[in-house]
Amino acid sequence: MTSVRDRTLFIYWGRRGSISEFLIELTKIADDGTLFSVSRQNELFGQIIRSGACIVPVDTFSRGFGAIFGLFRLSRIRRQLLAAIEKYRIDKVVVLMSHVWTPLIADSIRRTGARYIVIVHDASGHPGDRTAIVNRWLMRDALKADEVVTLSAYVKSALIARFPQLEGRTVVLFHPVIRSLAASGGARTGRPVGFLFFGRILAYKGLPLFVEACELLRARGRDFRIGVAGEGHLGDLAGRLAALDAVIINRWLDYDEVSTVLSQYDCMVLTNIEASQSGVVALAHGFGMPVIATPVGGLTEQIKDHRSGLIARRVAADASADAMELFVTDGELRKQLSEGVAKVQEDFSMARFFERLTEQRSEKAQ
């Protein structure tokens, strides 16, 4: 039996990244009982405002040191939120991703009687990610929450191992797809299969493994294209990528550029050496792209092996190369994977995610 939908306020105060797109997708399916608190400094703020959703805009900061020097704004932000909660009779506040300031307003929100829900994306920091240094502070948000939501069983397990007190109030949902479009059905006519490595270039993303896998596949005589798109340090990998004729876009891509880049490729490749779950997988599936990934973290929960993508046998260049070779050589498999991605778009839709979040009223977390 379907429960009554909670009147919900979603909070995301980050400036850029996949959660901005996550929020835009939520605004498309939100009902009249839904509010969104968004930073005016968000790179997609204009697009979010134009969505027509009910927005509670706040001023945060545009540079890292603003987290400290901008704290004087927090009192005003707190008043804005509490007024909105009262005016719209909000039942539930959902933090889509903790911000350095959200632990400071958690207690005030809970005192209104609204349930405070925090989505935890990572149980601990990722190697090479500078935001890892604030992970312990951000965890204060989860520890204050009435309920914690993770997007994979892997993260829930790691989170409870670190904070056993969260076991009774943590639930697992799923990472919804972003920008659902029709699956391509295989390689574009008249050109080789294209593989894309996408997103911020950080140590845990395993770009060296991707490059080595491509070198192995090229040595086997296979014809394919590759692209690398995202900001981060390439170092000596730049020369090796050039030797592979890779198309390199080594910077942050804006919203429209993402669509242009992804439309040029047939398969996303993740060669992570560590992962929680991945917004890149959610984006790829939204674009109808199968995903090849290493068997780490929650990636094996997002990607259904031989249904919506391929999971390499192990975290090694030759294993990734084997999976990529299978994708290149087996046209029937490519068609099968595209059909599987279409099913993922349905099963992991943002509409289902929104429904699950807003209908879980006051039930005890299982």
Feature map (PLM): residue ranges:
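Donor nucleotide-sugar binding/catalytic pocket of nucleotide-sugar-dependent glycosyltransferases
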Residues: 144-183
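A conserved mid-protein helix/loop that constitutes part of the nucleotide-sugar donor-binding site
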Residues: 20-25, 193, 202-216, 282
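An aromatic- and histidine-rich active-site surface loop
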Residues: 93-114, 276
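N-terminal strand-loop element at the rim of the active site
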Residues: 12-17, 24, 28-73, 99, ...
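A short, well-ordered alpha-helix in the C-terminal region of glycosyltransferases
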Residues: 326, 333-347
